[in-house]
């Protein structure tokens, strides 16, 4: 079966009140257009055309090589939008899915089912319909006694009998491509809006004696359109629960799905536990038997097995196995932790590599550093990596011990097994197994407080 798709994505989305094209607003970490593109490709489509209008440059930049983009310069209706794809499909011999770019909940399985039924039935067109308890505001699908589609009637034009119909048009179609665009050119804008409606093509086909079929959708939420921020948030909830349920089926424990946020495409290993108010974003990959959260945000990170991360933020970092992070740690881009590393409370790490078994338990900043194995970094240690113009490297070799409240002024190296005395400001390299001390000598003045009071 040769199957192409046209995604109608030209609308401005006025009710979104945004400078961003509606189809580029995000759900579960991806623009809604991305979800639609993924669904049509997974349904077996071999060629995709996106019809852009408002914000066409942004839409084109996002689509890239994933599809061809054509421009609808004036928004004159859905039939007019589809007609803009004619140049890309003139000689296409197969079938065409038509979907809206603001239906990110539409499943690939639904589109595949529609296309398969359409091809097997021999119909010139097949609609995707849905049964709604309250169809108010929707166009009703009227069928013949044989079960074929007779026409679609808008609510304002429907008779009392037609108003009792609960089957509605979802705006998703499958057509035979040969002859489609000639039929589209017969549609006239004879309506209040002065637009070319794609629904009018059904009556054109029926009047020619051609068969139009319909497939009824099992879950009407799949075609829930998005026209404002309220509908966007509702769609986000539906999609988020799909993502979480898929993870749970795969063996992930999610303590509170209502308060857990995982982007589509995030990978999580089995027996990992995700606690409330945890955000897993971007291309994050989590191993098995981890405990994440509560209250953690992990963005574009690769995390191994058996790690514990609580109340912390990790961005573009790589974590080995058996690490403990937090509470209140901040791992910035370029951070790499080996196995069995401890990063404790109020620790910030940036563009640094921490070796096997090393510990940074609390109240420290580590930036542009390479730390070896089994290094202990005491509380209040600061790598002074920036002189106002350039960043410099700090190196702590295997087994080094850094006392509390130490300043390491880069570029500087502390050798293997070396010890830095607490309170030191280290500006020169410390050799292997040496003690580095760089602080003022303590002086005790006897009876000083008493003398101060006497002189005051």
From Swiss-Prot:
InterPro entries: Bifunctional_GlmU, GlmU-like, GlmU_C_LbH, Hexapep, Hexapep_transf_CS, MobA-like_NTP_Trfase, Nucleotide-diphossugar_trans, Trimer_LpxA-like_sf. Pathway: Nucleotide-sugar biosynthesis; UDP-N-acetyl-alpha-D-glucosamine biosynthesis; N-acetyl-alpha-D-glucosamine 1-phosphate from alpha-D-glucosamine 6-phosphate (route II): step 2/2; Nucleotide-sugar biosynthesis; UDP-N-acetyl-alpha-D-glucosamine biosynthesis; UDP-N-acetyl-alpha-D-glucosamine from N-acetyl-alpha-D-glucosamine 1-phosphate: step 1/1; Bacterial outer membrane biogenesis; LPS lipid A biosynthesis. One of its GO terms (molecular function) is magnesium ion binding. Keywords: Acyltransferase, Cell shape, Cell wall biogenesis/degradation, Cytoplasm, Magnesium, Metal-binding, Multifunctional enzyme, Nucleotidyltransferase, Peptidoglycan synthesis, Repeat, Transferase. The active site is at 362 (proton acceptor). Transmembrane segments: none annotated. Residues 251-456 are annotated as: N-acetyltransferase. UDP-N-acetyl-alpha-D-glucosamine binds at residues 8-11, 22, 72, 77-78, 139, 154, 169, 227, 332, 350, 365, 376. Its cofactor is Mg(2+). One of its GO terms (cellular component) is cytoplasm. Residues 230-250 are annotated as: Linker. Residues 1-229 are annotated as: Pyrophosphorylase. It catalyses: alpha-D-glucosamine 1-phosphate + acetyl-CoA = N-acetyl-alpha-D-glucosamine 1-phosphate + CoA + H(+); N-acetyl-alpha-D-glucosamine 1-phosphate + UTP + H(+) = UDP-N-acetyl-alpha-D-glucosamine + diphosphate. One of its GO terms (biological process) is regulation of cell shape. Its EC number is 2.7.7.23, 2.3.1.157. CDD domains: GT2_GlmU_N_bac, LbH_GlmU_C. It holds the Pfam family NTP_transf_3. It comes from the Bacteria. It is an enzyme of class 2 (transferase). The keyword Repeat applies. Acetyl-CoA binds at residues 379, 385-386, 404, 422, 439. In the N-terminal section; belongs to the N-acetylglucosamine-1-phosphate uridyltransferase family. In the C-terminal section; belongs to the transferase hexapeptide repeat family. HAMAP family: GlmU (MF_01631). Homotrimer. Catalyzes the last two sequential reactions in the de novo biosynthetic pathway for UDP-N-acetylglucosamine (UDP-GlcNAc). The C-terminal domain catalyzes the transfer of acetyl group from acetyl coenzyme A to glucosamine-1-phosphate (GlcN-1-P) to produce N-acetylglucosamine-1-phosphate (GlcNAc-1-P), which is converted into UDP-GlcNAc by the transfer of uridine 5-monophosphate (from uridine 5-triphosphate), a reaction catalyzed by the N-terminal domain. This is Bifunctional protein GlmU. It comes from Desulforamulus reducens (strain ATCC BAA-1160 / DSM 100696 / MI-1) (Desulfotomaculum reducens).
């Amino acid at each position: 079966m040769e199957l192409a798709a046209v995604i109608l994505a030209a609308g401005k989305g006025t009710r979104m009140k945004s400078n961003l094209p509606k189809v580029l607003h995000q759900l579960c970490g991806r623009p809604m257009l991305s979800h639609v593109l993924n669904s049509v490709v997974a349904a077996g489509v071999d060629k995709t055309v996106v019809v852009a209008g408002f914000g066409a440059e942004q839409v084109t930049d996002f689509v890239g090589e994933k599809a061809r983009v054509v421009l609808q310069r004036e928004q004159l209706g859905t039939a007019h939008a589809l007609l803009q794809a004619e140049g890309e499909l003139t000689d296409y011999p197969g079938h065409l899915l038509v979907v809206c770019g603001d239906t990110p909940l539409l499943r690939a399985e639904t589109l595949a089912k529609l296309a398969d039924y359409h091809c097997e039935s021999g119909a010139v067109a097949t609609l995707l319909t849905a049964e709604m308890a309250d169809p108010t505001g929707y166009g009703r699908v009227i069928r013949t006694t044989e079960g074929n589609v007779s026409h679609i009637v808008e609510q304002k034009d429907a008779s009392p009998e037609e108003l009792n119909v609960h089957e509605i048009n979802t705006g998703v179609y499958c057509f035979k491509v040969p002859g489609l665009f000639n039929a589209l050119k017969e549609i006239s804008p004879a309506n209040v809006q002065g637009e070319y409606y794609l629904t009018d093509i059904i009556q054109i086909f029926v009047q020619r004696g051609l068969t139009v079929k319909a497939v009824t959708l099992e879950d009407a939420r799949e075609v829930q359109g998005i026209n404002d921020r309220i509908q966007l948030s509702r769609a986000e909830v539906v999609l988020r629960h799909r993502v979480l349920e898929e993870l749970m089926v795969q063996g992930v424990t999610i303590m509170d799905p209502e308060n857990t946020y995982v982007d589509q495409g995030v990978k999580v290993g089995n027996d990992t536990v995700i606690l409330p108010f945890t955000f897993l974003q971007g291309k994050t990959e989590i191993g098995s038997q981890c405990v994440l959260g509560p209250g953690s945000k992990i963005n574009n990170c690769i995390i191994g097995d058996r790690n514990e991360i609580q109340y912390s933020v990790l961005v573009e970092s790589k974590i080995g196995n058996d690490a403990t992070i937090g509470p209140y740690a901040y791992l910035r881009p370029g951070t790499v932790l080996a196995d069995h590393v401890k990063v404790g409370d109020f620790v910030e790490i940036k563009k640094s590599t921490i070796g096997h078994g090393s510990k940074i338990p609390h109240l420290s900043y580590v930036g542009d550093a390479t730390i070896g194995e089994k290094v202990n970094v005491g509380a209040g240690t600061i790598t002074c990596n920036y002189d106002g113009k350039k960043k410099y490297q700090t190196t702590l070799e295997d087994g080094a011990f850094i006392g509390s409240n130490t300043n390491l002024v880069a570029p500087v190296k502390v050798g293997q097994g070396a010890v830095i005395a607490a309170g030191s400001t280290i500006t020169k390299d410390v050799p292997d197994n040496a003690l580095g001390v760089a602080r003022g000598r303590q002086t005790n003045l006897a009876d000083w407080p008493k003398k101060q009071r006497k002189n005051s």
